């Protein structure tokens, strides 16, 4: 979903505040602070990638595009979390791996045993019997 007018206005306002020289650019080293001021979490790896791609500064158009993409990712992440919460009966943030495998085989689009096994390995790489679905969602969204 595209950014709302309110979100777009907030992004532009934040850009202007951080454009100290008023040259239409902000240092890529400040992008993390700008995003956090907008309530958007970003990893150091994402910031490093952005800096490698753009160099020392980012213009408003690229900034707006980056933030809009980040907002879409965040919305998708929240949708996944909501879906997992349905199966988190005790609100612990964890789901039993065996139950997860059963859900994957029986609900929605039926997955093959091999597909389910791959998903389970990704969800519970240490084979502990349960997994933190917040962490799982962040890992799959990062791919």
Curated annotation (Swiss-Prot):
Ranges where the EF-hand domain occurs: 6-41, 75-110, 111-143
Deletion phenotype: Cells are viable and complete sporulation normally at 28 degrees Celsius, but form four-spored asci poorly at 34 degrees Celsius. In sporulation-defective cells, the forespore membrane (FSM) is formed abnormally and F-actin localization is aberrant. Only fragmented or anucleated FSMs are formed and F-actin dots remain at peripheral regions of mother cells even during meiosis II. Sporulation defect is alleviated by overexpressing myo1 from which IQ domain is deleted.
GO molecular function: calcium ion binding; enzyme regulator activity
InterPro entries: CALM/Myosin/TropC-like, EF-hand-dom_pair, EF_hand_dom
Keyword annotations of the record: Cytoplasm, Meiosis, Membrane, Repeat, Sporulation
One Pfam short name: EF-hand_7
Keyword Membrane attached: yes
Subcellular location as annotated: Cytoplasm; Prospore membrane
Gene Ontology cellular component annotations, sorted alphabetically: cell cortex; cell cortex of cell tip; cell tip; cortical cytoskeleton; cytoplasm; cytosol; mating projection actin fusion focus; mating projection tip
Cytoplasm is among the record's keywords: yes
Superkingdom: Eukaryota
Signals that turn on the gene: Five-fold increase in meiosis in mei4-dependent manner.
GO biological process: actin cytoskeleton organization; ascospore formation; ascospore-type prospore membrane formation; microtubule cytoskeleton organization; spindle pole body organization
Transmembrane segment boundaries: none
Principal subcellular localization: cytoplasm
Subunit description: Interacts with myo1 and pik1.
PANTHER family listed in its UniProt record: CALMODULIN LIKE 3, MYOSIN LIGHT CHAIN 1, 3
Primary role: Plays a role in meiosis and sporulation.
Family recorded in the similarity comment: Belongs to the calmodulin family.
Protein name: Myosin 1 light chain cam2
């Amino acid at each position: 979903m595209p950014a709302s007018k309110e979100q777009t206005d907030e992004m532009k306002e934040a850009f202007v505040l951080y454009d100290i020289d008023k040259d239409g650019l902000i240092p890529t080293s400040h992008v993390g602070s700008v995003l956090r001021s907008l309530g958007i979490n970003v990893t150091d790896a994402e910031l490093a990638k952005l800096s490698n791609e753009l160099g020392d500064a980012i213009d408003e158009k690229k900034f707006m595009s980056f933030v809009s993409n980040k907002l879409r990712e965040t919305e998708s992440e929240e949708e996944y979390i909501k879906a997992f919460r349905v199966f988190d009966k005790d609100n612990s943030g964890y789901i039993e791996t065996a139950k997860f495998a059963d859900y994957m085989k029986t609900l929605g689009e039926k997955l093959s045993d091999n597909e389910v096994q791959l998903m389970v390995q990704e969800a519970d790489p240490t084979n502990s019997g349960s997994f933190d679905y917040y962490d799982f969602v962040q890992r799959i969204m990062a791919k």
